[in-house]
């Protein structure tokens, strides 16, 4: 599990801040909720699988 407050990079090189964790009600899949700081979705919130995320700083 990636800690809330961690700075992450996705597989495209975009950077985001982890703000929460979320488990899908029906599938039970775990997601990391982030606020994008760079890239195409700056300022937006997104729920991501952790597979393609790299922790830059905790």
PLM regions: where:
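Short beta-strand-centered aromatic/proline hotspots
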Residues: 14-24
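Short acidic/glycine-enriched loop/turn segments that link adjacent beta-strands
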Residues: 26-28
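Intrinsically disordered, low-complexity, charged/polar segments
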Residues: 31, 36-58
């Amino acid at each position: 599990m990636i800690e809330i407050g961690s700075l992450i990079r996705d597989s495209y090189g975009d950077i985001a801040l982890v703000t929460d964790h979320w488990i899908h009600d029906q599938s039970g899949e775990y997601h990391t909720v982030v606020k994008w700081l760079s890239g195409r979705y700056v300022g937006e919130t997104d729920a991501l699988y952790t597979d393609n995320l790299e922790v830059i700083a905790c």
